[in-house]
Amino acid sequence: MTLHLQAAGLACERDWRLLFEQLDFELGAGDMLQISGPNGSGKTSLLRLLAGLMQPTAGQILLGGKPLAEQRHALASALLWIGHAAGIKDLLTAEENLTWLCALHQPASREAIWAALEAVGLRGFEDVPCHTLSAGQQRRVALARLHLACPPLWILDEPFTALDKQGVAQLEAHLAAHCEQGGTVVLTTHHTLERKPSGYRELNLGQWAA
């Protein structure tokens, strides 16, 4: 599908505190939006709004010109969400985690899962229980999903957390390649991106921070 995501007059409150208001932006094929701002400025809340996990205080989000609330099926098909937590099961192996996660959307073959783990530097860790992995390795298990799923919209909350220098460089390249191939990325990160696609821009929520 050709992605067109629009925020119009978007506002969000948490615990009776205004995080942001009157946000207007549009995202399409090839775009990357980095959301920045101090802690507590609403970065994760904005991601959750765009992913359909929260409702805005005011304004609306449109997908393909229609309200997001009316596009649940289309959003589920278009979206890959990876939150700040790795979101994996400690007692499952790396392969089992990816098999389970993919089964929720689009099942993947064992060969594809092993190739994805190799792509994130985890060759040889396929059968290792995730509770024995380091934080960086657990994060890479979660990020291996980016090598398996092909939805156009990737929404990622602090994806570079716990990655080493090589992992950061590999992820930057993969995100840029996704945009160059017509995908869309929305992310939060405190990391300064070295590789940015032509459709990159930044949205700073700091102006509303108390």
UniProtKB/Swiss-Prot annotation:
Keywords associated with the record: ATP-binding, Cell inner membrane, Cell membrane, Cytochrome c-type biogenesis, Membrane, Nucleotide-binding, Translocase, Transport
Q: How does it sit in the membrane?
A: Peripheral membrane protein
For biological process, the GO terms are: cytochrome complex assembly
Listed binding positions for ATP are G37, P38, N39, G40, S41, G42, K43, T44
Please indicate if the UniProt record lists Translocase as a keyword: yes
Entry-linked Pfam families: ABC_tran
Q: Where in the cell is it found?
A: Cell inner membrane
Q: Which domain of life is it from?
A: Bacteria
Alphabetized CDD domains for the sequence: ABC_CcmA_heme_exporter
InterPro entries on file: AAA+_ATPase, ABC_transporter-like_ATP-bd, ABC_transptr_haem_export_CcmA, P-loop_NTPase
Reaction catalysis annotation: heme b(in) + ATP + H2O = heme b(out) + ADP + phosphate + H(+)
Q: Which SUPFAM superfamilies does the UniProt entry name for this protein?
A: P-loop containing nucleoside triphosphate hydrolases (SSF52540)
Does this entry carry the keyword Ribosomal protein?
Answer: no
Q: Give the EC number(s) listed in the UniProt record.
A: 7.6.2.5
A GO term, aspect molecular function: ATP hydrolysis activity
Q: How does it assemble?
A: The complex is composed of two ATP-binding proteins (CcmA) and two transmembrane proteins (CcmB).
Q: Which family does it belong to?
A: Belongs to the ABC transporter superfamily. CcmA exporter (TC 3.A.1.107) family.
Protein's UniProt name: Cytochrome c biogenesis ATP-binding export protein CcmA
Originating organism: Pseudomonas putida (strain ATCC 47054 / DSM 6125 / CFBP 8728 / NCIMB 11950 / KT2440)
